Amino acid sequence: MNRKPDVEVVFEFNGTRMNPAADGYRPAHLITDNYLTTGVHHYYQMNAVPPNGTAKGTITFLSPEAYPHSLWIGKKINIQEGDRIVGYATIVKIFNSLLCSEDRA
């Protein structure tokens, strides 16, 4: 995936994972109440985040055109492996204007 990142976030892992999340990790993200999508994580100034760690970085989503206008600054989305929540990502900046909620802009 060679696209630019869609969002900048603060990652918070909850200790559920057994191993650190390495740069390039591709979990699912609960974008809306009923839409999970894959996204690629890149972490600033670190190669991996511990299972209960936090980091700032970016997410590049697989198919942002499928869930337009669904994100806003401050929204907290689940990071999941299947149905298991392994952490959260809080949106701090939206680079892809297609994703920016018109109601909360």
Region annotations inferred by a language model:
Residues 1-105:
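C-terminal effector/interaction modules appended to NTPase cores
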